């Protein structure tokens, strides 16, 4: 029969605290209660003194390491909270809320500046704010604070006010995306190999982020055609540093300061590359309902393909996708303007098209202003500066009742443009905005754009609406009409080259994005449509529409059918077609499917098998026909701790054999340590996890779990900026002989930050031991046993027995009571085979004086009579057992 007495004794201190306070203890409760110590079954004549705890809500003066919960939301870190006795009534105790802790509450400025402090400014004076409740929940090691919303800054679920934003720690980052492909032609025997990549290296120093982007391409082709005048080997290689830049957050302004090479991201004007500086309201700092629209890129790959997203020659995103429809939705809302999409198929075909990212109506909360100020010199590809000095500014002012007034100006010596617009929040009907932009251009010589002065106007209307009840969103960001003589800054810069053919010259642009899920009907619809008309050339129309239906057929559950129609046009070439897919479950984590692709002169049909091995790994196999030839392809993807790995292989009868590899990852190094990791957002925000040196600890945060390396470090990448991110240890997958006493952390990080959070993890065996002092007695009840890392690994019972975690051969530990280490124990090496047979451990005193256990610390909860002052800090009392 198991002996439960040891368990009872180990939790006895907290049983007393909970019985005394009813789990939750008000710091300034008034009612008194009485205790009968006879309910405690203790051995011998152990003394119990509960008179100090007869006041409801009383917490013994001392230091407690607690998780602070503000309005049911935990703050990012645990805090050492001091309790001090009341000056007028020592039977009451109060929590010392330091200025650093109060700063995390997100109080309004007028509330924070009127707060009063006690203990020489070290503690918030209690009772100042009406309706505030502060309670101690010792069972959960928590300080629970309730603050009326009227005292707090604007908040949103999972979004924190600026007072809680974390700039992270200093460090070095190096992120990369590498794609390698090899191809062998069956006819002629030609071979081609290509390696392409892009990435970001950078340094974080305090709030500053310094970055450099690179991109590279290597191609090697070997022809076996003796009649080919270009036969033989051909090698092309290129390496470029595409961009140097730096930025930092300005939390007090809810803005971002950027320096170096940049792309003008404007809510009013068309963008272009420049070198200079800007200060702008950062939409990422705004609550989610006020942020911009993140680009959504969709397409259809006929075979396994490499998809490259670029802007003005700079690669923004590159990945490998399997055959079929794809959507890229993780670019972030900081990317705007015209994006160029290039899809390189394994069969050698290339699709290219441009998309114009939709823009949300430029609205602002009433009484607030959003703005952008920029200046510098325009820049061509390759860091070449062109044109003269320019400057510009734009702003949106929330007037009242949902109305916003916005406008801006941009120009240099020979080009000026100005815009004025108005927006309206229609509440349940969405939001709409209308603006007019006028441009004046002075051309000094004959160009493709003409000569002399040109004046023109451009008119734009935008609309956006979320249908929360229907899980859908429609964003309509065009109609835009431009007069023939209207010029953007980019067109003006092109006009400086007299030999250049005129670009742009837009007439009309329509852009619509619609996404809706009819949950009850099991139907989802997605539409992305763009149409451009021009004054001097043919129009272009691009669209992608997906219709999916999920249904059951008899005993077969969760079947699906989807239909995709698409058209992409670029450089007078159009690719259009239709893709159909029917899938059904096959076991718990697998599906079988039929896929057909018809159009653009290439028809194909395949039967596929998809299987998800675990949360991090899946693969896909397809066999079918393409152009009346047999085709076989496979695709494998793994989200590893060190990198995201994608593998592909393709065989097309009589035409080609190919294989591909894609790696996306990075390295992060700080003074706290570092790790290799996977990533998709180059140079983006990340969270460095420290598991106290314990390897193979599974950490869940963003996507599949990552595991700590041999140094106990891991990186959770691609975390959201200015969002409350959470990471936690998967306790079900912890290594054997590892325990986590703290398994959840959270952080709200500024853009590009390297956050740092530490888990309390103990590694080693478990043992039941008995501690004895030199005089044969034992340490007092409630004494703590700590290892050399200051981790509490055990709590002494009333007979000196202790349950130890994290036991290692020959390890040194110390025993603490009254906040002081009194004696040391050394574990045997090797450890005995049976660690639960009452291992006797002598506790050797520290210094020349043997430890003495005085009577006044024998009570279950030690009485401490000293009053806390800033110069005489309270004795430490652990609250984590």
Swiss-Prot record:
Disruption phenotype: Deletion of the operon under classical laboratory conditions does not result in any major effect on E.coli capacity to form biofilms compared with the wild-type strain. One of its GO terms (biological process) is pilus assembly. InterPro entries: Fimb_usher, Fimbrial_membr_usher_CS, FimD_plug_dom, PapC-like_C, PapC-like_C_sf, PapC_N, PapC_N_sf. It is found in: Cell outer membrane. GO terms for molecular function: fimbrial usher porin activity. GO terms for cellular component: cell outer membrane. Keywords: Cell outer membrane, Fimbrium biogenesis, Membrane, Signal, Transmembrane, Transmembrane beta strand, Transport. Pfam families: PapC_C, PapC_N, Usher. Residues 1-29 form the signal peptide. It is a multi-pass membrane protein. Part of the yfcOPQRSUV fimbrial operon. Could contribute to adhesion to various surfaces in specific environmental niches. Increases adhesion to eukaryotic T24 bladder epithelial cells in the absence of fim genes. Probably involved in the export and assembly of fimbrial subunits across the outer membrane. NCBIfam families: PRK15284.1 (NF011812). Belongs to the fimbrial export usher family. This is Putative outer membrane usher protein YfcU. It comes from Escherichia coli (strain K12). The gene is yfcU.
């Amino acid at each position: 029969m198991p002996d439960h007495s040891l368990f009872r004794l180990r939790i006895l201190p907290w049983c007393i605290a909970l019985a005394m306070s009813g789990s939750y203890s008000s710091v300034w409760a008034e009612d008194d209660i009485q205790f009968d110590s006879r309910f405690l079954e203790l051995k011998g004549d152990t003394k119990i003194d509960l008179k100090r705890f007869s006041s409801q809500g009383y917490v013994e003066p001392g230091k407690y390491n607690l998780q602070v919960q503000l309005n049911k939301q935990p703050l990012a870190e645990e805090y050492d909270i001091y309790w001090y006795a009341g000056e007028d009534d020592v039977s009451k105790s109060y929590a010392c809320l330091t200025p650093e802790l109060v700063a995390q509450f997100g109080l309004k400025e007028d509330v924070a500046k009127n707060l009063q402090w006690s203990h020489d400014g070290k503690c918030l004076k209690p009772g100042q704010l009406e309706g505030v409740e502060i309670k101690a929940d010792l069972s959960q090691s928590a300080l629970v604070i309730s603050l009326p919303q009227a005292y707090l800054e604007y908040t949103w679920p999972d979004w924190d006010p600026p007072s809680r934003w974390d700039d992270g720690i200093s460090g070095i980052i190096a992120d990369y995306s590498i794609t390698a492909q090899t191809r062998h032609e069956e006819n002629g025997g030609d071979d081609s190999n290509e390696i392409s990549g892009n990435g970001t290296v950078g340094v974080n120093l305090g709030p500053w982020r310094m970055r450099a982007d690179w991109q590279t391409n290597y191609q090697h082709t070997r022809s076996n055609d003796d009649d080919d005048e270009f036969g033989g080997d051909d090698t092309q290689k290129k390496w470029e540093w595409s961009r140097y830049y730096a930025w930092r957050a300005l939390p007090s302004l809810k803005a971002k300061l950027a320096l170096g090479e940049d792309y003008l991201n404007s809510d009013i004007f068309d963008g272009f590359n420049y070198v200079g500086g800007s200060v702008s309201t950062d939409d990422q700092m705004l609550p989610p309902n006020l942020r911009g629209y993140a680009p959504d890129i969709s397409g259809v790959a006929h075979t396994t393909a490499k998809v490259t997203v670029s802007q003005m020659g700079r690669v923004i995103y590159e990945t490998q996708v399997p055959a079929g429809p794809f959507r890229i939705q993780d670019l972030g809302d900081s990317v705007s303007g015209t994006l160029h999409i290039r899809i390189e198929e394994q069969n050698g075909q290339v699709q290219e098209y441009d998309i114009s990212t939709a823009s949300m109506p430029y609205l602002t909360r009433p009484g607030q202003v959003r703005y952008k100020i920029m200046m510098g010199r325009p820049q061509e590809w390759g860091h070449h500066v062109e044109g003269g000095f320019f400057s510009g500014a734009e702003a949106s002012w929330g007037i009242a009742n949902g109305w916003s007034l916005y406008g801006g100006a941009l120009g240099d010596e020979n080009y000026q443009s100005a815009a004025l617009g108005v927006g309206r929040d229609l509440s349940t009907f969405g939001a709409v905005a209308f603006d007019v932009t006028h441009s004046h251009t002075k051309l000094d010589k004959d160009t493709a754009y003409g000569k002399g002065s040109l004046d023109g106007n451009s008119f734009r209307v935008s609309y956006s609406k979320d249908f929360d009840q229907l899980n859908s969103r429609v964003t309509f960001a065009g109609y835009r009409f431009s007069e023939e003589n209207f010029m953007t800054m980019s067109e003006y810069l092109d006009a400086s080259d007299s030999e250049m053919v005129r670009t742009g010259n837009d007439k009309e642009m329509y852009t619509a994005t619609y996404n809706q899920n009819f949950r009850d009907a099991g139907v989802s619809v997605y539409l992305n449509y763009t149409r451009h008309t021009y004054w001097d050339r043919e129009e272009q129309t691009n669209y992608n529409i997906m219709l999916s239906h999920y249904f059951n057929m008899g005993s077969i559950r969760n079947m699906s059918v989807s239909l995709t129609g698409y058209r992409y046009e670029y450089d007078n070439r159009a690719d259009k077609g239709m893709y159909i897919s029917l899938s059904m479950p096959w076991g718990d984590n697998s599906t079988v499917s039929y896929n057909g692709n018809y159009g653009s002169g290439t028809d194909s049909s395949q039967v596929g098998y998809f299987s998800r091995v675990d949360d991090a790994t899946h693969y896909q196999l397809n066999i079918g026909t393409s152009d009346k030839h047999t085709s076989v392809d496979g695709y494998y993807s793994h989200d590893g701790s060190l990198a995201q790995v994608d593998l592909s292989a393709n065989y097309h009868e009589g035409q080609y054999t190919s294989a591909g590899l894609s790696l996306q990852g990075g390295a992060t190094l700080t003074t706290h340590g570092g790790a290799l990791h996977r990533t998709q957002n180059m140079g983006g925000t990340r969270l460095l996890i420290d598991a106290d040196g314990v390897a193979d600890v599974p950490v869940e945060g963003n996507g599949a779990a990552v595991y700590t390396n041999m140094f106990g470090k891991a990186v959770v990448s691609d975390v959201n900026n200015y969002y409350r991110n959470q990471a936690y240890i998967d306790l079900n997958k912890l290594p054997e002989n590892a325990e986590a006493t703290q398994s959840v952390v959270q952080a709200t990080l500024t853009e590009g930050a390297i956050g740092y959070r530490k888990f309390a993890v103990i590694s080693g065996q478990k043992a039941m031991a008995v501690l004895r002092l030199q005089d044969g007695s034992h340490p007092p009840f409630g004494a703590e046993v700590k290892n050399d890392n200051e981790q509490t690994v055990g709590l002494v019972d009333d007979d000196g027995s202790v349950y130890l975690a994290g036991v290692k051969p020959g390890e040194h530990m110390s025993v603490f009571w009254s906040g002081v280490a009194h004696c040391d124990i050394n574990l045997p090496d090797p450890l005995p085979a049976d660690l639960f047979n009452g291992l006797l451990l002598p506790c050797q005193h520290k210094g020349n004086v043997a430890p003495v256990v005085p009577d006044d610390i024998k009570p279950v909860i030690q009485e401490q009579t000293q009053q806390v002052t800033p110069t005489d800090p309270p004795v430490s009392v652990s609250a984590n057992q």
